[in-house]
Amino acid sequence: MPKHGKKYLEAGMKIESERLYAPDEAVSLLRDISFANFDETIEVHARLGIDPRQADQTVRSTVVLPYGTGKTVRVLVFAAGEAERVAREAGADYVGVDDLVQQIQGGWLEFDAAIAMADQMGKVGGLGRILGRRGLMPNPRSGTVVRDVNDLPGVLGDLKGGRVEFRNDRTGIVHLGIGRKSFTEDQIRGNLFAFVDALQRAKPTGAKGVYLRTLTVKSTMSPGIHLDVPATVAAAGQAAA
């Protein structure tokens, strides 16, 4: 078992380990127990009732966090011609095709998200082994393969503004950063509810029994706080209505 420092242990003493917290209480407590001297990421960890070995039980989707992630998102767009011009005007950080493919093959990965125009996927597809394992590969399911150039500014704006992809890991848990410690409680709650609502909507058809088993929130360095799942799902549904 890893040894924790004094501040971590003191933070843990403020949490009732057997209690399931309502969202408002959890967010308030979370800010109180975050002790690091940097702007920690606020994390949510959702344990799902799925068998990740089964293809029809995979959870993979996106959510637009209404208050963003708290970090600057560098977006790369694989586009040429008119789409290249539109991407640059819409605020893409890197735009091109052949030159970017070559740079990525050489090990360059200084971006946080990637979009590809559909007509460039023939060239981009070969990057799957490099980008796929890092969650950077453009994908139709996540909306990052664009067919109509008129849709490009909207997709780019969503990524810049807080659109993030989530997926289950090999143990059936989804991990997502939903903001920073410097966010207000309303902002953290808003992002939490948006994620939980998106997670509910992403329930796979093959999932049986209880889908959302546990929800835990924490900051980068803090202990976790266990949420009351039914109360959180209900609050997320009300917020989305």
Regions found by a protein language model. Name each.
Residues 6, 18-21, 25, 36-39, ...:
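Conserved active-site and cofactor/substrate-binding residues in soluble primary-metabolism enzymes
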